[in-house]
């Protein structure tokens, strides 16, 4: 097997003592990895896409935790405030996933049954956005890794499939979960169908109303779907009593899904972002992208990714961050979040609950407060009060940058992208597209041939109501006041850790 390691590739062999990494000569790089390619640098001027064969798909996930200069803070038990152990997570997750959550191994083998399902759509293509570059009249080179070719139309099956696999292996009858825009819910419904598990989904009410066909997609794959807040849980009923038209939030939907899972021995909960094992599953995106950028003969100067809970961003960026830490490339890596839900750029780095009802372990992360309810922006998958603890920790180490962008600028960029590249993006990655366009315009001003990499983590075929709102002129940007943040932060526990 061959993997990118900075400027070259390494062959990996196994022995009794573990993994051996042997640098390959340039000619061997070509033969081992790219078949009939005759060079490792340069590309035909007309080349738009870079494709890997199925046998070149990575067979391991990458765990960045052991490579960091400092370990991330532990999750805390909500009752004792002591570091949470495996038994504290057992009511929610199977032990295999708990062990991945706390793993100190840099690489985890992908099970064969998971690889077989991955091959339905993986490896995914890397595109050079030549027509967008031309429209922008920029010397920049823009590359995007497209995850919209999966059955659910996004990157989410990269983790829903292994989560369903490990739960099925543990004898779980049903998985519960939350979803915002419906990308995660539909991905888990697809995965559960592959392994014969029931699936019950609480979808944020604002998105449930705005994106009805995602509900239908989930039901096609056998899932049961409820708007959140719902009258099925005590927490949901309390919120509806206060506001019958409550728009919901991902934090609320998580609380309802956890409330259904925790009391039952044969029911577990699946999370679509935030946690370490979820981000680790997504690193197959970045591992493939490293190989494909090598095919293109380019190394990114700037990597941008949309961030809500952090799974898409971590999946693309962590393998590149590994190479940066090893001194093999010098890439600026930037999180891009919605201006209406800016947990990194305006939130505090504090211990907080992952859900709104305070049922989960406390995690140290950038948060706007677990009771924060974002305005109903169209990027429903980014409406989460916190940021992945791992992404937050790496940001605190000074290894990442962050910016926030309003949704009208994002959709302006999405329209330009769709009219040049042909793909209608989901609302979530429009944030990364807008950031890439900003970088391309900077390159135009400076005359520098900046290489930009991003992930188009899903298509927007079921998000056309959002595009209709933009094209009709009814879409607005929301101003998040300091008072709104302060009010939500008032309920965050005060923990000296």
Predicted regions and their residues:
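A short, small-residue-rich loop immediately preceding and capping a beta-strand
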Residues: 159, 170-206, 299-313, 333, ...
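Active-site-proximal loop->helix
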Residues: 184-247, 343-353, 464-472
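Positively charged, low-complexity intrinsically disordered leader regions
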Residues: 47-172
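Alpha-helix C-terminal capping segments
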Residues: 162-172, 186-198, 219-220, 317-327, ...
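Short glycine/serine/threonine-rich phosphate/pyrophosphate-binding segments
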Residues: 157-162, 177-195, 209-212, 307-317, ...
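Active-site nucleophile and cofactor-binding loops and adjacent substrate-binding regions
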Residues: 146-159, 175-184, 275-278, 304-309, ...
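Claisen-condensing/thiolase-fold acyl-transfer catalytic domains that form or cleave C-C bonds
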Residues: 307-311, 315, 407-472
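Active-site/ligand-binding loops adjacent to catalytic centers
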Residues: 107-109, 239-277, 297, 322-330, ...
């Amino acid at each position: 097997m061959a993997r990118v390691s900075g400027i070259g590739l390494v062959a990996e062999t196994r022995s009794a003592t573990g993994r051996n990494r042997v640098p390959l000569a340039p000619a061997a790089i070509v033969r081992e990895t790219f078949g009939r390619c005759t060079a490792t640098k340069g590309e035909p001027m007309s080349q738009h896409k870079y494709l890997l064969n199925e046998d070149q798909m990575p067979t391991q996930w990458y765990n960045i935790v052991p490579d960091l200069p400092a370990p991330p803070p532990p999750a805390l038990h909500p009752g004792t405030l002591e570091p949470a152990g495996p038994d504290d997570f057992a009511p929610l997750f199977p032990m295999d996933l708990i062990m991945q959550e706390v793993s100190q191994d840099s690489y985890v083998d992908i099970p064969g049954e998971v690889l077989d399902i991955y091959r339905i759509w993986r490896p995914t293509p890397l595109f050079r956005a030549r027509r967008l570059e031309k429209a922008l009249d920029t010397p920049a080179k823009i590359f995007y890794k497209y995850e919209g070719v999966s059955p659910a139309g996004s990157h989410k099956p990269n983790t829903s499939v292994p989560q369903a696999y490990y739960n099925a292996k543990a004898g779980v009858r049903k998985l519960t979960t939350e979803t915002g825009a419906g990308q995660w819910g539909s991905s888990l419904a697809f995965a559960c169908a592959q392994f014969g598990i029931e699936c019950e989904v609480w979808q944020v009410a604002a998105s449930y109303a705005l994106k009805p066909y995602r509900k239908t997609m989930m039901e096609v794959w056998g899932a049961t779907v409820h708007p959140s807040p719902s009258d099925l849980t005590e927490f949901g009923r309390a919120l509806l009593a206060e506001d019958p038209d409550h728009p919901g939030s991902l934090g609320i939907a998580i609380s309802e899904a956890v409330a259904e899972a925790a009391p039952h021995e044969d029911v577990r909960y699946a999370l679509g972002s935030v946690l370490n094992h979820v981000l680790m599953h997504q690193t197959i995106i970045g591992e493939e992208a490293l190989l494909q950028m090598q095919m293109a003969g380019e190394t990114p100067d700037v990597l941008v990714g949309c961030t809500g809970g952090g799974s898409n961003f971590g999946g693309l960026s962590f393998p590149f961050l590994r190479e940066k830490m090893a001194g093999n490339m010098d890439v600026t890596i930037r999180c891009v979040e919605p201006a209406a839900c800016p947990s990194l750029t305006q939130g505090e780095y504090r211990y907080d609950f992952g859900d709104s009802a305070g049922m989960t372990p406390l995690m140290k992360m950038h948060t706007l407060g677990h009771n924060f309810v974002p305005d109903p922006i169209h990027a429903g998958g980014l409406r989460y009060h916190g940021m992945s603890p791992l992404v937050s920790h790496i940001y605190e180490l000074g290894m990442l940058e962050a910016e926030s962008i309003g949704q009208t600028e994002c959709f302006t960029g999405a329209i330009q992208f769709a009219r040049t590249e042909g793909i209608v993006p989901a609302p979530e990655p429009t944030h990364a597209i807008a950031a890439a366009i900003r970088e391309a315009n900077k390159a135009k001003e400076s005359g520098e041939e900046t290489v930009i990499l991003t992930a188009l983590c899903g298509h927007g075929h079921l998000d056309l109501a959002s595009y209709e709102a933009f094209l009709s002129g009814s879409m607005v940007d929301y101003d998040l006041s300091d008072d709104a943040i302060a009010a939500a932060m008032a309920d965050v526990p005060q923990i000296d850790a």
